[in-house]
Design a protein with these regions (language model features):
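Conserved HGGG/HGGXW glycine-rich cap/lid loop of the alpha/beta-hydrolase fold
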Residues: 19-68
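Flexible "cap/lid" loop of the alpha/beta hydrolase fold
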Residues: 115, 122-153
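Helix-loop "lid/cap" segments that line or gate small-molecule binding pockets
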Residues: 158-173, 180-186, 197-204
Length: 277
């Protein structure tokens, strides 16, 4: 499962609240914080980071429980907990404010961070983001229910199955980054347990709790959505746009993984967002 595609930057780590959080950082300029979803990692941004790093300070962390970050079984790994950890990461990297872009559950982290700590967010970008009660998707709900049984199966089974499902519509180079994201789950019982804990933490109550507060966001916001997204249906996109004052929306010819499927278009959208004030 090793990828031939190198990451856009080598991983470094920060110690935050007793946790080791891995991140990739490249470039100089105004900070852009890129947040991945499930079951990916900072490798989601392999084809977005290099271009943006030509003009920006690009930071892509592995959320707790993902990638090369710690995978604790005794800590809260919900999207709210992830959002609460982001200011500490920004402090460690000496970043006051950033343009924050989140994909999938990373979009929930970005929404919650913007609502709770608006002084840390200069602009908000949401890419095929979970929102309101759009999640967990049925496949993840089924996996949550089956977690006790899945936990007894050979560890490699779930990651092989995930890879085969998710890579169907991805270009070859994106498949390599997907496999690199999945490869960190080293197919041992401990990492399988950590992955299932991430799945069990998927809970729409976190985004539902801040839905009314989206109307208080007063930074430039932009929503990008794959018009053929099978996991977060495109119907959610205009609802999310309309909930955030002044937000704009762009539908692209893509499935769920726009950063892998249409990286050039996404880079253009992020650059346009970063130019707004």
């Amino acid at each position: 499962m090793n990828s031939r595609m190198p990451p856009f930057a080598e991983a470094a780590t920060a110690d935050l609240d007793g946790l080791t959080v891995a991140y990739r950082r490249a470039g100089q300029g105004e900070p852009i914080l890129l947040l991945h979803g499930i079951p990916t990692s900072s490798r989601l941004w392999d084809f977005v980071g290099p271009d943006l790093a030509g003009d920006f300070d690009v930071i892509a962390p592995d959320l707790v429980g993902y990638g090369r970050s710690d995978k604790p079984l005794d800590r809260d790994v919900s999207v709210s907990a992830q959002a609460d950890l982001m200011p500490a990461l920004m402090d460690a990297l000496r970043i006051d404010r950033a343009t924050v872009v989140g994909h999938d559950i990373g979009g929930a982290v970005a929404q919650i961070l913007t609502v709770r700590r608006p002084e840390r967010v200069a602009r908000l970008g949401l890419v095929d983001s979970v929102c309101f009660d759009s999640w967990p998707i049925p496949q993840m709900t089924a996996l949550k229910r089956a977690a006790p049984l899945v936990g007894k199966l050979p560890p490699g089974w779930i990651f092989t199955a995930l890879g085969s499902v998710l890579e169907r519509d991805l270009p070859e180079r994106a498949r390599e980054s997907l496999q690199a994201s999945l490869a960190v789950w080293d197919r041992s019982p401990d990492t399988l347990a950590a992955f299932l804990r991430n799945v069990e933490a998927l809970d729409s109550s976190h985004t539902e709790a801040i839905s009314a507060d989206l109307g208080k966001i007063d930074v430039p916001a932009h929503v990008v959505w794959g018009a053929a997204d099978p996991f977060q249906r495109p119907e959610w996109a205009p609802r999310l746009r309309d909930a955030i004052p002044g937000a704009t929306l762009r539908l692209v010819d893509s499935g769920h993984f726009v950063p892998w499927e249409r990286p050039d278009e996404l880079v253009a959208e992020i650059r346009a967002l970063a130019a707004r004030s």
